[in-house]
Amino acid sequence: MRLAVFGGSFDPPHNGHLALCLYARELLQVDRLVISASNNPLKDAPQAADRDRVKMAELLAETINRTGAFAEVSSWEANRGHPVYTIDLMEYLEEIYSTSDLTLLIGEDNFLNFRQWKSWEELIRRYSIIVFGRKADDGASDDSAISERLHDQSFRHIDLNLPLSSTEIRKRLASGDDCSAEIPSPIWQYIVENQLYQ
């Protein structure tokens, strides 16, 4: 089994996350996608509660699976109640799914501090890594710039040209803006019904 792993805060999930997952299904030739709502040790604590972020990740998976089962959510990280490192998640999933054929999907914002990650060299050695960019006019979106930053060629870079940011969406939601165009409909409905990010 070829497994893709997409971890993130998902605070909240947006259409950029959805596009990344759909790209993985259609073009990366992986059998299954595991979405993991994480507590990133290198970022501020998420604004939404873990249970809400896991639920929104589940709604993201349901949206992806409307055209066939592909994505599922792991709550292993969120249930541990403290930050978990990516290498720990990958090793856990290797054991659970009995496969070492894992591909790590990360956003370019997280990639920029990749060398601060625990065991980042081991991640490169053991797993395929695909970095997804948000927009083409960002200087960091150039393949050569990313290669220079990491000094390694064992990854791919794919630019989705979707300049969406959960941080910016949270700010807009706190100001009372309507962000329904940037967020998958079931997730938007959940945010409104549960009065998140107000």
Curated annotation (Swiss-Prot):
UniProt cross-references to InterPro entries, sorted A to Z: Cyt_trans-like, NadD/NMNAT, Rossmann-like_a/b/a_fold
Protein's GO biological process: NAD biosynthetic process
Gene3D superfamilies reported in the protein's UniProt record: HUPs
Family in the record: Belongs to the NadD family.
Protein known as: Probable nicotinate-nucleotide adenylyltransferase
Known EC number: 2.7.7.18
Top-level taxon of the source organism: Bacteria
Molecular function GO terms recorded: ATP binding; nicotinate-nucleotide adenylyltransferase activity
Keyword annotations: ATP-binding, NAD, Nucleotide-binding, Nucleotidyltransferase, Pyridine nucleotide biosynthesis, Transferase
SUPFAM superfamilies linked to this entry: Nucleotidylyl transferase
UniProt enzyme class: transferase
Keyword Cell membrane recorded: no
HAMAP family membership: NaMN_adenylyltr
The protein's role, per its UniProt record: Catalyzes the reversible adenylation of nicotinate mononucleotide (NaMN) to nicotinic acid adenine dinucleotide (NaAD).
One Pfam family cited in the UniProt record for this chain: CTP_transf_like
Catalytic activity as recorded in UniProt: nicotinate beta-D-ribonucleotide + ATP + H(+) = deamido-NAD(+) + diphosphate
Organism in which the protein naturally occurs: Chlorobium phaeobacteroides (strain BS1)
Pathway terms, separated by semicolons: Cofactor biosynthesis; NAD(+) biosynthesis; deamido-NAD(+) from nicotinate D-ribonucleotide: step 1/1
